[in-house]
């Protein structure tokens, strides 16, 4: 028996399924029920529903359509292998071997041109994968083409643009048969399957006792026919989720009809009457625009002429959402014949929030807004639980970081449990990401950021006996040794670059090892500038870093060689053993990599492909396979579900939320391959990603029981310019405005305002916390900030701190206070230290020196020039990697060295026989102790390779006061690029008086911050 059931609600189909199972149990209690579903998510929902209704759900199989039909083929037909020799993977490897042999034929000229200069057969592998995918589609949707090609008919009317395809298919088929493999494939199996079922010569126990097909929105024509044929031997119940109670297989999207009208009437001799015979009424515009996938499926089912049962349930028009669902159910469009005025439109209650549209500035704001809206729904509806809410988006991986940031960091009192499905193992696992980075090293620049992303993976750190502190230490060494990119000169040559080693990993390691072995050195050692900051037990970390760099070098060298798959298995296993020390969870991930390699071995063995594989092919294969492996789905686990918009997610939820409904993003548009003959000759029922996405949106609209929530990026985060939503959102909004209105709404403005909420850029906008605003937020942590708005004067301290006794004073503390009084207060009294940011690592060698690097370079050159060692200093700078590579270093520093030499010539006469003076003064009973360096027979001298600034002169003034108060009658000089500045000698008593004023200021500065930076003070004094 083959029975079709139509219903607009999945709940009704579930109830029917329960009734059929409970009232008509299988004769053998140990035989499983078989329910065909399209996705694991649907299977999970159905298990929970069956268990809730029946008390238990056990001994039930939930196969997917392709796997079920193949198992049915093996049960009914003879000589059907467990794995088809015509599956996409087998076709790919077969084409890899056969296609190069065909390129000399005229028909293959386009492919021959494409495959020119194909190093390592990488382009061939990519092309064969695409051709195999196209052939696989032909087997399902154009089996008659395949049959004609195999019989020698090239179908020239169809293949005129791609005459190579029938030739290549015949060659491929003959090759597979020549290997002694089965001739069965999905193109010829269906006819054989139907014939075998009619003959009845097979073991009936291999088929399930009965079959339910549940929650599948579309199947290929031959799949449906195979199910009907199967119904001759077992009971097959095909449950169709049909959004409309009337036949709608012939309705047409009005916009599409308008385009057809224009093209039709532009042809000579064409009339409107002739067009009307070909195209029918468009019915409900939402159904006609978004329902092409379901419409084609309905058309296929109607052609079966099988018995049908209808189980439709009307929606109560208590809300806008239910009214729209009822319009679709009744194929109704009140505004189809005329524009409705306000009196003719259906009236909605003013508080209706069943359909919500939210405009945000960014994906993060979308998630933040969603969180507040969900909290409001949960507050308003006490019976609403997180498991009643599903949130879908075009790409869940793009939103996952924002979801975890907002939902994962919510405080306990407003925490909403959540789960994220549909992420791949690669997206969830840093270990797999690091493995793929290791695989990509042969064509990588091996930059510092890439390498450290590999090293900081916990399993890698464990392998090299490192922890987070040691990792940070290594980062500092890398930054100090100017490592930027590249293993060494040889690796750069392999990438077509000049053979230079500066700023490479080998360059930096040599500096570290030389520094550890030799210590501090004033000269180069064999052209190496030793880095002497590594000593003692840190040598172990240096050794681990060297071993890790050896691993990188091993990957770069061994991965670029072509090998048979067994050789690749050996090399990759070697990499895994050398790179990772896995824990229990990591071991599962590493086993996944090995399973993919074993899968590749099996595919090549099945295809009898024995040629060596290049690194590029292996990298692409492993990346694709690991990228398609799903992590734990965690779908329907009692929490808010985040998942990707994908087919058969039309599970009913009370609240359905759609994020990322942006123009150009959804519906997704994937252009067909240029050699896809199905795109040139389309038919009803052909799959299209854009049509699939339109139907997914319609399913989401129909599966929402209480609220449909839609958000999109409606404003630019850069300039606040408006952005339009997805065309599907616009169509829904337009439909609602044409057919519905709120009370007292005469121009649609009120309805639009009710449906669409535009949110501000920031979550702490005062619009969220203003009583008269319709916006709201549960994020009470923003309230203190908002309460301070308008308070122009914010007192950091209500009163000064209690003074601490000052028993003595170091000169260094007094100088630090003069340099930055506020910073000194925070450090001395509040114990707050403004440490500089972490190490900033660069991925490019220096091309142009930045301001800070230029100043540091000038200071080093000035110091060296004063000591008449400028040339040696320049050589060390080159050897340390601070300067650009090659002649650029000479050109960029030529004027700089000249200026430093001139300045040194001016300073040198003042510096002769330097002294270091100990100062011991008593200022107002407080001892002031310290040392003054750079004191010469004629003066105290300071210099800097920059213009003299206020902080320099204040520092010099304080040192000058200490010098004079200590009984020295000397001048104090400061040399800068803007000239020479000095202070004349002071009387000792006067200098002590000035120091007492500084001491008083110092005491005050320990009780409260003094807003008097040295630069500002010098400008005021000047």
Segments predicted by a language model, with ranges:
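Polyanion-engaging groove/track-forming segments
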Residues: 1-1022
């Amino acid at each position: 028996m083959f029975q079709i059931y139509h219903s607009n609600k999945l709940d009704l189909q579930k109830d029917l399924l329960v009734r059929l199972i409970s009232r008509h149990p299988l004769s053998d209690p140990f035989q499983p029920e078989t329910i065909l579903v399209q996705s694991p998510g649907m299977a999970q929902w159905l298990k929970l529903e069956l268990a809730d209704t029946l008390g238990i759900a056990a001994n039930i199989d939930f196969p997917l359509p392709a796997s079920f039909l193949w198992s049915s083929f093996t049960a009914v037909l003879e000589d059907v292998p467990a794995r088809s020799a015509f599956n996409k993977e087998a076709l790919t490897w077969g084409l890899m071997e056969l296609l190069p042999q065909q390129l000399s034929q005229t028909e293959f000229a386009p492919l021959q041109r494409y495959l020119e200069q194909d190093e390592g057969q990488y382009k061939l592998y990519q092309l064969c994968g695409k051709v195999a995918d196209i052939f696989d589609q032909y087997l399902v949707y154009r089996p008659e083409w395949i049959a004609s090609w195999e019989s020698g008919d090239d179908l020239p009317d169809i293949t005129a643009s791609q005459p190579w395809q029938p030739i290549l298919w015949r060659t491929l088929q003959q090759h597979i048969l020549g290997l002694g493999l089965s001739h069965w494939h999905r193109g010829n199996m269906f006819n054989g399957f139907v014939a075998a079922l009619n003959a009845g010569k097979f073991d009936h126990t291999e088929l399930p006792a009965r079959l339910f097909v549940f929650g599948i929105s579309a199947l290929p024509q031959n799949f449906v026919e195979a199910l009907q044929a199967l119904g001759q031997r077992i009971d097959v119940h095909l449950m169709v989720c049909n959004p409309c109670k009337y036949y709608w297989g012939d309705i047409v999207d009005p916009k599409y009809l308008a385009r057809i009208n224009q093209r039709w009437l532009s042809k000579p001799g064409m009339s409107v009457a002739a067009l009307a015979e070909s195209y029918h009424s468009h019915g409900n515009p939402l159904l006609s625009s978004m329902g092409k996938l379901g419409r084609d499926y309905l058309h296929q089912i109607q052609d079966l002429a099988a018995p049908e049962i209808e189980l439709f349930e009307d929606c109560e028009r208590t809300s806008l959402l239910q009214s729209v669902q009822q319009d679709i159910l009744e194929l109704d469009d009140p505004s189809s014949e005329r524009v409705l005025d306000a009196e003719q439109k259906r009236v909605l209650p003013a508080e209706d929030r069943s359909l919500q549209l939210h405009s945000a500035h960014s994906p993060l704001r979308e998630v933040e807004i969603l969180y507040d809206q969900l909290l409001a729904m949960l507050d308003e509806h006490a019976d609403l639980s997180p498991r009643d809410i599903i949130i879908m988006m075009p790409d869940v991986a793009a939103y996952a970081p924002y979801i975890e940031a907002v939902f994962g960091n919510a405080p306990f009192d407003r925490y909403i449990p959540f789960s994220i499905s549909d992420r791949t193992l690669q997206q969830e696992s840093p270990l797999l990401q690091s493995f793929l980075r290791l695989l990509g090293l042969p064509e990588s620049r091996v930059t510092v950021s890439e390498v450290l992303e590999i090293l900081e993976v916990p399993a890698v750190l464990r392998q090299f006996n490192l922890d987070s502190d040691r990792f940070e230490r290594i980062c500092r060494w890398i930054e100090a040794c100017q490592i930027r990119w590249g293993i060494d000169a040889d690796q750069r040559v392999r990438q077509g670059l000049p053979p230079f080693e500066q700023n490479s990993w080998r360059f930096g390691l040599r500096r570290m090892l030389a520094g550890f072995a030799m210590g501090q050195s004033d000269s180069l050692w064999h052209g190496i500038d030793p880095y002497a900051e590594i000593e003692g037990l840190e040598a172990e970390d240096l050794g681990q870093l060297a071993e890790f760099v050896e691993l990188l070098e091993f990957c770069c060298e061994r991965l670029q060689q072509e090998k048979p798959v067994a050789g690749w298995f050996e090399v990759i296993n070697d990499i895994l053993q050398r790179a990772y020390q896995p824990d229990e969870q990591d071991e599962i991930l590493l086993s996944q990599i090995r399973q993919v390699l074993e899968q590749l071995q099996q595919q090549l063995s099945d295809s009898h492909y024995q040629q060596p594989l290049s690194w590029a092919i292996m990298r692409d294969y492993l990346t694709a396979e690991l990228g398609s492996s799903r992590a734990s789905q965690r779908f329907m686990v009692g929490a808010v579900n985040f998942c990707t918009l994908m087919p058969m997610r039309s599970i009913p939820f009370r609240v359905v939320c759609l994020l990322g409904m942006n123009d150009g993003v959804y519906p997704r548009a994937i252009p067909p391959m240029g050699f896809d003959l199905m795109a040139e000759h389309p038919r009803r029922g052909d799959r299209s990603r854009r049509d699939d996405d339109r139907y997914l949106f319609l399913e989401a609209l129909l599966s929402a029981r209480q609220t449909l929530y839609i958000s999109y990026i409606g404003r630019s985060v850069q300039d606040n310019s408006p952005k339009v939503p997805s065309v599907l959102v616009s169509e829904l909004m337009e439909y609602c405005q044409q057919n519905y209105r709120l009370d007292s709404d005469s121009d649609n403005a009120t309805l639009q305002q009710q449906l669409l909420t535009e949110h501000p850029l920031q979550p702490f906008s005062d619009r969220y916390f203003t009583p008269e605003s319709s916006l709201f937020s549960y994020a009470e942590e923003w309230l203190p900030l908002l309460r301070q708005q308008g308070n122009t004067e914010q007192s950091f301290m209500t009163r000064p701190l209690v003074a601490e006794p000052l028993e003595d004073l170091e000169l260094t503390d007094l100088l630090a206070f003069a340099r930055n009084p506020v910073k000194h207060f925070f450090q001395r009294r509040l114990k707050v230290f403004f440490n500089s940011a972490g190490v900033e690592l660069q991925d490019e060698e220096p091309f142009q020196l930045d301001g800070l690097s230029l100043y540091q370079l000038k200071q080093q050159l000035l110091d060296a020039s004063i000591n008449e060692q400028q040339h040696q200093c320049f050589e060390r700078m080159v050897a340390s990697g601070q300067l650009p590579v090659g002649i650029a270093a000479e050109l960029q520093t030529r004027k700089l060295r000249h200026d430093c030499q001139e300045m040194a010539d001016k300073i040198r006469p003042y510096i002769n026989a330097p002294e270091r003076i100990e100062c011991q003064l008593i200022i107002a009973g407080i001892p002031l102790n310290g040392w003054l360096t750079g004191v010469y027979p004629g003066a105290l001298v300071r210099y800097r390779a920059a213009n003299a600034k206020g902080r320099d002169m204040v520092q010099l003034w304080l040192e000058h006061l200490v010098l004079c108060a200590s009984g020295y009658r000397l001048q104090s000089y400061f040399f800068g690029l803007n000239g020479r500045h000095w202070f004349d000698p002071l009387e000792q008593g006067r200098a002590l008086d000035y120091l007492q004023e500084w001491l008083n200021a110092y005491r005050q500065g320990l009780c409260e911050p003094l807003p008097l930076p040295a630069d500002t003070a010098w400008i005021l004094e000047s």
